[in-house]
Swiss-Prot record:
Name of protein: Peptide chain release factor 1
Modified residues (N5-methylglutamine): Q235
Species whose genome carries this gene: Nitrosomonas europaea (strain ATCC 19718 / CIP 103999 / KCTC 2705 / NBRC 14298)
Lineage: Bacteria, Pseudomonadati, Pseudomonadota, Betaproteobacteria, Nitrosomonadales
SUPFAM superfamilies attached to this UniProt entry: Release factor
Keyword Ligase part of the UniProt annotation: no
Family: Belongs to the prokaryotic/mitochondrial release factor family.
Pfam families given in the database record: PCRF (PF03462), RF-1 (PF00472)
GO terms for cellular component: cytoplasm
Function: Peptide chain release factor 1 directs the termination of translation in response to the peptide chain termination codons UAG and UAA.
Gene3D superfamilies documented for this protein: 3.30.160.20, 3.30.70.1660, 6.10.140.1950
Gene giving rise to this polypeptide: prfA
Amino acid sequence: MNKGIIDQLTRLSMRLGELDKLLSTEKITADLDNYRKLSRERAEIEPVTELYRTYQQVEQDLATAREMSSDPQFRDFAEAEIEADRRKLTNIETEILRQLLPKDPNDERNIFLEIRAGTGGDESALFAGDLFRMYSRYAEREGWQVEVVSQNPSEVGGYKEIIVRIIGHGAYSRLKFESGGHRVQRVPATETQGRVHTSTCTVAVLPEADEIADITLNPADLRIDTFRASGAGGQHINKTDSAVRITHLPTGIVAECQEGRSQHKNKAQAMSVLIARILDKQVRAQQAEQAATRKSLVGSGERSERIRTYNFPQGRITDHRINLTLYKIEQIIDGELDELCSALAAEHQAAQLAAMTEK
């Protein structure tokens, strides 16, 4: 391991000792909030410090085995020990680096999932409907809730646009790599010549903002409009201005909600989407700066970036960011996304590890 990582592990080991002393004092145990905070910190750093202790012990064992190898009587035994200790060190180092990787603070959050039809006309809208069903099925498998925030259905089925809130522990960590352009290749039902058509949709995955900590908006920067809902919902759509549109004037970002009967609830939901979009814009600006010096293996997450192709005639799905092709399109479209999500997460982690070891 390089010196920077060794220094970091040394600091964490010292901090663990400090925390043990603090947590045993009456002053800390009497302050429940502080006690919980320090206990959480200890729980976070203890596993990696334990690994580092094991790493140091194996290093000592390796040094002893090397000394023994100079004695002809123990050479064969020592060389076997040296090989075993080297393997142990490699495995422990990999796990240490994995635990030192920076945690994404948004990973455990709920998300807003936005799907928009792109090129391809009616077929694109139908594909947007397929993607919505795919993510909804996946959420169902994970035990998550799906709430429709707003929708613009197509006349032929599917959606020109649909925005949903997915509520579930770890939703962002599993779906954050879905942002980007999704392309479908298939024969439309209306195609009489059997020709394959290509259509596209864009997907955006935004972590739901913390209601208190993440962002504060100046009311003077907001324009709030109410209007009559144009979608499903019953007779009330012609009687009340329950739909709400909020515009953030400094950025021009807009969010609206018309799914609920209550203007108050629609306003709250639209505000949540607006904040998520503003934060997403800030994060993507930061990522663009970082990408100028290092391009992520799993792509930039830009909405225009084509990330995946769904080829129905060949029964395959290809993720272009990691060159992964799976011949199980029916299962994936039915919500079996684990293999794809896990492969993308693993590639992202590998890129982070590579960056860490280069420092």
